[in-house]
Amino acid sequence: MAAFLRCPLLARHPPLARAFATGARCPFMGFAHRAAPELQEDVERPQIPAVEVLEELLRDGGAALNRTVRDCMDEDAFPYEEQFQAQLGALRRTHTYRVVTAVGRRADAPPLGTRGTAPHTSVELWCSSDYLGLSRHPAVLRAARAALDAHGLGAGGTRNIGGTSPLHGALERALALLHRQPRAALFSSCFAANDTALDTLARILPGCQVYSDAGNHASMIQGIRRRGVPKFIFRHNDPHHLEQLLGRSPPGVPKIVAFESLHSMDGSIAPLEELCDVAHAYGALTFVDEVHAVGLYGARGAGIAERDGVQHKVDVVSGTLGKALGAVGGYIAGSEALVDAVRSLGPGFIFTTALPPQRGGGALAALQVVGSAEGAALRRAHQRHAKHLRVLLRDRGLPALPSHIVPVRWDAEANTRLSRALLEEHGLYVQAINHPTVPRGQELLLRIAPTPHHSPPMLENLADKLSECWGAVGLPREDPPGPSCSSCHRPLHLSLLSPLERDQFGVRGAAAG
């Protein structure tokens, strides 16, 4: 009855009987009259503990879990399930089917984690992209908790509709300053940042051509493909091939040259200045993905461009909050007009919920750590441990590539077998990297990511156990180990260990250096 009395139409009809009669003919009030008590705002909701609700959902959902997409269709409909199973079968036959390993990272004891019911309930994590361990840094956690208490769990909307907090603006300004660019824009992930920025730029630049490195990440490839513009693939990190391709384009045509400063899988570092100089000589914008370099290179942790002193030659830089900075999210930085255009016209920025404020608070604190003396010390320790591990692996005749990401390359089947053996037999979690993350034929046995929190004994143990599993699987070794990588022929820089580092790492590291 209270609902009827609040209706502006029925308020003009005081007699209750007449009000009910009118309400029966009103579509809105008729619905209110028939509504169940649970839908009425003045009915108290039962207080059921969230755990009991979840248990009830899981208990009652068993039947629904067994349904297929064909259950509500005629027999002559397309065989959807069979097609799905055929695709999955092909992955299993080529040893590229993805099995997710559930590991709970321990914030109190990096780089350890837990596996629950597995034989080794405690595991060492060797494939995390939390390169510096900042996701559990006390200052980062305090800032994230403070933002959570102040603003709640979610952003509450898109950036344009109620989802922009003061923390979003502060983080964008800090990221722009980090890369010495006028402006930055945050995205839900760096996949979204690359995809949206490249797609939007290709759309708004008339007749745009895109020149893409052959090793680019899937997010860049998707953004380039989405618009269907003319695209040209240059050999990985090859400025001479890039120049050959650019030389065929008319000078007045807008062009974008897109590449990664540090390759996400093999860890190779691009000749950044040379690529930028070639691009600018032919009037092309440079779009540089610094995802795996931010926080790890440069005096302030801005990446390879800062390390090489060429930040001014990068027109658009993309980065992530989710690796060395220990948070979640992505961003681009560039000129005021360029970033504003992507922000104003990019669907991946406009039509998605903004990053939660606590992510911004935590990321701001992580940036402060990265730019401090502590951050510089973490970067030194990170690089030192990567060098040490390469020494140990090469000593054992294992084909390690030269990078802070230490990939050990072999075929897909061996990838899976060795990764499983390391985890199940020794409690060492190193993920095999297979197609489509890398092209067929370029599968990486292990993508090892040592951190400052892996101790020298941990590095020794990993090398010993990997060597043991390598022999058990029957894989050949490189004997004697050469001074350069057998895959890319780049020097391994084993001699870069300082006397202090050699003393710390013992006889093996010193002898190999």
From Swiss-Prot:
**Protein localization:** Mitochondrion inner membrane
Q: Principal localization?
A: mitochondrion
**Would the keyword Transit peptide turn up in this protein's UniProt record?**
yes
Q: Which GO biological-process labels does this protein carry?
A: erythrocyte development; heme biosynthetic process; hemoglobin biosynthetic process; protoporphyrinogen IX biosynthetic process
Annotated catalytic residues: 323
Give the EC number(s) under which this enzyme is classified. 2.3.1.37
According to its UniProt record, in which tissues is this protein expressed? Erythroid-specific.
Chain sites annotated for binding succinyl-CoA? 98, 212, 231, 437
Q: In which pathway does it act?
A: Porphyrin-containing compound metabolism; protoporphyrin-IX biosynthesis; 5-aminolevulinate from glycine: step 1/1
**Amino acids binding pyridoxal 5'-phosphate:** 190-191, 264, 292, 320, 352-353
| Cited CDD domains | KBL_like (cd06454)
Q: Looking at the UniProt record for this protein, which Gene Ontology cellular component terms does it annotate, in alphabetical order?
A: cytosol; mitochondrial inner membrane; mitochondrial matrix; mitochondrion
Residue positions of the PTM N6-(pyridoxal phosphate)lysine?
Answer: 323
Recorded GO MF terms: 5-aminolevulinate synthase activity; pyridoxal phosphate binding
Keyword Transit peptide: yes or no? yes
- The record places the transit peptide at 1-18
| Catalytic reaction(s) noted | succinyl-CoA + glycine + H(+) = 5-aminolevulinate + CO2 + CoA
- Could you list this entry's UniProt keywords, alphabetically sorted: Acyltransferase, Heme biosynthesis, Membrane, Mitochondrion, Mitochondrion inner membrane, Pyridoxal phosphate, Transferase, Transit peptide
Q: Which superkingdom does the taxonomy of this entry point to?
A: Eukaryota
Membrane topology, as annotated? Peripheral membrane protein
PANTHER family to which the protein is assigned, alphabetical: 5-AMINOLEVULINATE SYNTHASE, ERYTHROID-SPECIFIC, MITOCHONDRIAL, CLASS II AMINOTRANSFERASE/8-AMINO-7-OXONONANOATE SYNTHASE
Reproduce the free-text note on domains from the UniProt record. C-terminus is a mobile self-inhibitory loop which interferes directly with active site.
Q: What job does the chain carry out?
A: Catalyzes the pyridoxal 5'-phosphate (PLP)-dependent condensation of succinyl-CoA and glycine to form aminolevulinic acid (ALA), with CoA and CO2 as by-products. Contributes significantly to heme formation during erythropoiesis.
Quaternary state and interactors:
Homodimer.
- State the family named in the UniProt similarity comment for this chain: Belongs to the class-II pyridoxal-phosphate-dependent aminotransferase family.
The entry's protein name is 5-aminolevulinate synthase, erythroid-specific, mitochondrial
